[in-house]
Amino acid sequence: MKSERVNYPVKLLNFILSIMNSYLFVLIVSIGFAESSSPKSSTSCSLMTSCAVEKCLDRGMVGRIITESSRDEVFGNLVEKFDMVCIAAKCGNECSQCKHCHYALEQMSALAQGEKTSGLCPKLETCVFNCLTEDVSKVLSCVATRCNVHCYDGDCPSCKMISRRIFSNICKQHSMTTQPQIKYEGTCPNLFMELADDYVAMKKKKL
């Protein structure tokens, strides 16, 4: 990743942060996972996950995505609704107690200001940084088409773990495994892993 700082005007920084709220979830929840194995951290992150699903994902919208999306589309349609800005605003206490959520906000700020991040998820971080430096006005579509996949392709296991927790919570609430277009006999976490692999394969075909 480039180490030099890129200076953006303040208004542009605010614009960057506002439009990156959903797609950068896959990056910013991923940092600090190495410290998240303690019981206290795990419990705190579970509270953050529950809060995120309750306050930052409209239940009706999620239900429509699950019932109206094809099996091939449901995963992407869901994970692209994960909103870190909302989590920071509405689940601030829970986020501050979850190390990789709290630290993630600092990483998002660093990215938006063109500063070097921790480098724990090299492909994902480099991809987002490149989207910012290439054309900030198109950063949303750039991150969606080029970077989102790195949360699930093995580059960033911590990102995949957090996404799996949120997905599994939603899956259980909405009985996803029994949906006619899904028809999955296993558990929600296993469904996540299968759909994530399919998502990566589909994304790579489009690149």
Curated annotation (Swiss-Prot):
Membrane topology per the record? Single-pass membrane protein
Query: Where in the cell?
Result: Membrane
Q: Which residues cross the membrane?
A: 13-33
A Gene Ontology BP annotation from the UniProt entry? defense response to Gram-negative bacterium
For this UniProt record, give its keywords in alphabetical order, as a comma-separated list: Membrane, Transmembrane, Transmembrane helix
Q: Name one GO cellular component term.
A: membrane
Q: Does the keyword RNA-binding apply?
A: no
Question: Known Pfam families for this protein?
Answer: DUF5332 (PF17266)
Keyword Membrane in the entry? The reply is yes
Q: Function, please? A: Acts downstream of daf-16/foxo to suppress tumors induced by disruption of gld-1. Potentially a direct target of daf-15/foxo.
Q: Can you name this protein?
A: Protein dct-5
Upper classification of the source organism reads: Eukaryota, Metazoa, Ecdysozoa, Nematoda, Chromadorea
